[in-house]
Structure formats: structure tokens, C-alpha cells
Amino acid sequence: MTAPTTRKDLMIVNMGPQHPSMHGVLRLIVTLDGEDVVDCEPILGYLHRGMEKIAENRTIIQYLPYVTRWDYLATMFTEAITINGPEQLGNIQVPKRASYIRVIMLELSRIASHLLWLGPFMADIGAQTPFFYIFRERELIYDLFEAATGMRMMHNFFRIGGVAADLPYGWINKCLDFCDYFLTGVAEYQKLITRNPLFLERVEGVGIIGGDEALNWGLSGPMLRASGIEWDLRKVDHYESYDEFDWQVQWQREGDSLARYLVRISEMTESIKIIQQALEGIPGGPYENLEIRRFDRLKDPEWNAFEYRFISKKPSPTFELSKQELYVRVEAPKGELGIFLIGDQSVFPWRWKIRPPGFINLQILPQLVKRMKLADIMTILGSIDIIMGEVDR
């Protein structure tokens, strides 16, 4: 009788691009030794649409509808970065009311993004209930967005010098009611998930990143803060009106998937804190800076002459980008979202380089999944929080 032989060959498995846990068209070529991951190679580019090249032959106002297609779950941040760059190049002052409205919208968008991270992340590791729960709160946020901007997603709401429209009557009270309700929702999530032994078994000690390692890989956002680095661009860069509110940077030391979950859950309650303060202290005044004289134009142009530039909804395509370069960044839900902008005394940018947080955070995935089990790939990938529209651009 022949003795049974055990095969020692490695197995190569394709995960994606059509896979429910890939969060978009990501493809992983995984090399397995039984259940153990030997190697993992991400294949990107299935959703590449040439966003940087498109920007080079569009005015800023023409390009705004495109940018909401990068990270389509946190569109306010892509709009914010698109108008912050030209505002800094043109030295344009934003009215205080507009700045407060922007902060409110950005933080609501952060909560919506974190909610739609939490649901699929829990579904990936086998918990279906939170996946359905998160849509209750997310729908309420989208109702607020629809009332203020006219759109549930892809809002096209930010403008150079302010926002497209003022908050409608009764919106502030509606938003305050949502804030009170949402805090009970977060408490429910924590009760349901945080101490659940099955959940802890799947995430504790999985995908550990040390602080130095996170810095060396260029990680940002919750990925960096979960590794013990207290770094948040809202505190560091002092953009918009974040300095006027009382809030804390949320961070953890452990650097594993559980730490990344805890950072994002805590960030949602901090965002509510910021929104409540902004709603209660929102000043009066204009919501858009309509009359900006260009500083590099003639000294006293005629009122209706071509040199007098309005930076507003209607004539803003004539807004020229001065001949200088600038890197501008915001703290998006997934990390540091930045653009490197070069103006050329033209209405079109000469170069528009996008720094997407998801793309850079994803680079550490092969290192994290090596020597882990096949099932841990979903946990680790889910904890990174990627959107392929932003990764591929």
C-alpha cells in the first residue's frame, strides 16, 4: 500500500476585482501556504479616470463636479481641498459664517464616511447587524445635506470665497436634534460591538503597525493616530475655524485593527462636539465673498471693467491662478488629502497633483497580511478604509 503524500505547493489566489469585501475594484494576488499568507500583491488602476490631467484643462468651477468622484463617500473634503488651494493662491478671505458652514458640512461628511466604513467592516468580519444599523444615522445626515445643498451625494456646494448657498430656515435646529440623537446611536454601537468577545477575537492584535513604521510608510489619519502618533491637520494647520472650538485629537497606542476601530468611533463623537459648538456660535453675515478685487490688477479699475473680478457662482470661471506653486491639505476621514497646485497666470492650473490618503495607506497592506491567516486579510483591509475612486483617481 502506498503512503499518502502531502503536497507542499503554494497556492495563488485572486481576490477581486469583483469581490464584496474589496470595497471597490481592488485586486489582490495572494500566495497561500495552506491558510497562511506568504505574499500579497495589490493590483490597482481599474478605476483610473485621469483626474489630474482633466484638471489641467478645466477652470476651478468647472472641475468641482469632478472632484466629488474621488472619495465619493466624503465629497465635502474633496471640494474643500479644491477651493482652498485657489483661495490661498489668490489671497481670498472667506467670511466667518461661510467658514463655520464649511466646518459643519465637513464634520457631517466625516461622520457619514466613518459610518459607511463601520458597517461594511463589521459585515466583512461576520457581523451583519451593525451594517443595517448604520444606514439609519447615515440617512439622517444625507437628509441634512439634501436640505442644505440640494444633493444627497456629490454636493457641489463649496465655492471660491465661501459656499454656494446659506443654510435654509430651520436647518440649524434640525441639525442640533440630529446631534443629540446620534450620540445615543454611537453609545448603541459601542454597547453592541466594542466589548463583543467574537469581535475582539477577530481584531485584537491583527495588523499591528508601530509608530515609527507608520511614519516611515507615510500613513495618515486614523491609521497614524491608532499607532500612537497624535497628529491631526485640524490642530496642526489651523485651517477654517477649527481653532475656535474645544475638541481633542483621538488616538490609541496599540496600532492594531481594534485601535483603528476605536479611533474612528471616538472621532464621530468629537465631530458631533465640533458641530454643536459651530451651530450654537454661528455668526451672521454673508455666506460668500462676492466682491474681491484682484490684487495684481490695475490700481483703480472701472467698476464694470474687465479687470474688476467677482469671485462668485456666476463669473468665477474667469478667476486666474497666479504664477506660483502651493501644497494645500485637509484632514479627510481617511487621512491627509492634499493637492500640489502650480498656477501659470491662466484660468487653468498648470499642474494639479493629488495626494490621496487611501492610496498611500494601502501600500502597507502586503506587509501587514504576511504570516497572517487568509481570513485576516478582510479584517486588515477593512481597518485601512479605502475607496478605490480615490486610490486610482
Swiss-Prot record:
Gene designation per UniProt: ndhH
Family: Belongs to the complex I 49 kDa subunit family.
Top class in the EC scheme: translocase
One Pfam family from the record: Complex1_49kDa
Functional summary from the UniProt entry: NDH shuttles electrons from NAD(P)H:plastoquinone, via FMN and iron-sulfur (Fe-S) centers, to quinones in the photosynthetic chain and possibly in a chloroplast respiratory chain. The immediate electron acceptor for the enzyme in this species is believed to be plastoquinone. Couples the redox reaction to proton translocation, and thus conserves the redox energy in a proton gradient.
Domain of life: Eukaryota
E.C. designation(s): 7.1.1.-
Protein's UniProt name: NAD(P)H-quinone oxidoreductase subunit H, chloroplastic
Main localization, broad class: plastid
Single GO MF annotation: quinone binding
GO cellular component: chloroplast thylakoid membrane
Signal peptide (residue range): none
Membrane disposition: Peripheral membrane protein
Species of the source: Nicotiana tomentosiformis (Tobacco)
GO BP, sorted A to Z: photosynthesis, light reaction
Compartment annotation: Plastid, Chloroplast thylakoid membrane
SUPFAM superfamilies to which the protein is assigned, alphabetical: HydB/Nqo4-like (SSF56762)
Family annotation (InterPro entries): NADH_Q_OxRdtase_suD, NADH_UbQ_OxRdtase_49kDa_CS, NDH1_su_D/H, NiFe-Hase_large
PANTHER family (UniProt xref): NADH DEHYDROGENASE [UBIQUINONE] IRON-SULFUR PROTEIN 2, MITOCHONDRIAL (PTHR11993:SF10), NADH-UBIQUINONE OXIDOREDUCTASE 49 KDA SUBUNIT (PTHR11993)
